[in-house]
């Protein structure tokens, strides 16, 4: 059995991850961690996820359970994830990282850690989204400079980063396929007298409202026709199942910084 620890276990995504781990053959939750000031520390993780008692108590320090897990799943905040990364690197533990909002410099820290431990880092662990990335690469290569490209994403009102990590990853895939640098061609929102659109730019539009789990559309607009590639998530469980799948896939892997394209053999 692959022994899995979940960081941020008392949160919405954490609870969903606990459920996904317990539902997956070959995986088992052996540690659950949350912030030290959480009033839920000491509670049974299974009960937090409405699964009933499973005998794994929520703790407040990763060091307390270092011998209890093989791989840590972390969907928290960049500052928290980087601390956990340093811990897992020192302890020789594998990581699944679904946290978004990292800076370029912080992503480099992930790459450095990948030289010593196996890591799967992805902006989105949904199988559908990762298939979409493959389709986006194909579409961009075929359509080339003959289209305007816009990325529209929507998430719930509590999401703190924008554009979403998934939208940015979609932009990176499209830009790379076209031989462009996303940092140079991205346009984040428009207002006022913007002038005519530069065809080589990639536009981003962000919506934050209600309880939207995650909608992403990439629009390729030409004269007389347009192509839209859309993915809509209706449940966080799709991300959680992908993360657990990645945790099982990492078993026995050499150190490296992998992503879901590797897990799904889409390269």
From Swiss-Prot:
Gene Ontology MF terms in the entry: 4-hydroxy-tetrahydrodipicolinate reductase; NAD binding; NADP binding; oxidoreductase activity, acting on CH or CH2 groups, NAD or NADP as acceptor
GO cellular component: cytosol
Entries under CDD domains matching the protein: DHDPR_N (cd02274)
Pathway: Amino-acid biosynthesis; L-lysine biosynthesis via DAP pathway; (S)-tetrahydrodipicolinate from L-aspartate: step 4/4
InterPro entries in alphabetical order: DapB_C, DapB_N, DapB_N_CS, DHDPR_bac, NAD(P)-bd_dom_sf
Catalytic activity: (S)-2,3,4,5-tetrahydrodipicolinate + NAD(+) + H2O = (2S,4S)-4-hydroxy-2,3,4,5-tetrahydrodipicolinate + NADH + H(+); (S)-2,3,4,5-tetrahydrodipicolinate + NADP(+) + H2O = (2S,4S)-4-hydroxy-2,3,4,5-tetrahydrodipicolinate + NADPH + H(+)
Pfam families: DapB_C, DapB_N
UniProt-annotated catalytic positions: 155 (proton donor/acceptor), 159 (proton donor)
Sites where the protein binds NAD(+): 8-13, 34, 98-100, 122-125
Primary enzyme class: oxidoreductase
PROSITE patterns on file: DAPB (PS01298)
NADP keyword on record: yes
UniProt KW keywords: Amino-acid biosynthesis, Cytoplasm, Diaminopimelate biosynthesis, Lysine biosynthesis, NAD, NADP, Oxidoreductase
Binding site for (S)-2,3,4,5-tetrahydrodipicolinate: 156, 165-166
Annotated positions binding NADP(+): 35
E.C. designation(s): 1.17.1.8
GO biological process, one term: lysine biosynthetic process via diaminopimelate
Intracellular or extracellular location(s): Cytoplasm
Function of the protein: Catalyzes the conversion of 4-hydroxy-tetrahydrodipicolinate (HTPA) to tetrahydrodipicolinate.
UniProt-listed NCBIfam families: dapB
Family listed: Belongs to the DapB family.
Name this protein carries in UniProt: 4-hydroxy-tetrahydrodipicolinate reductase
The organism of origin for this protein: Pseudomonas entomophila (strain L48)
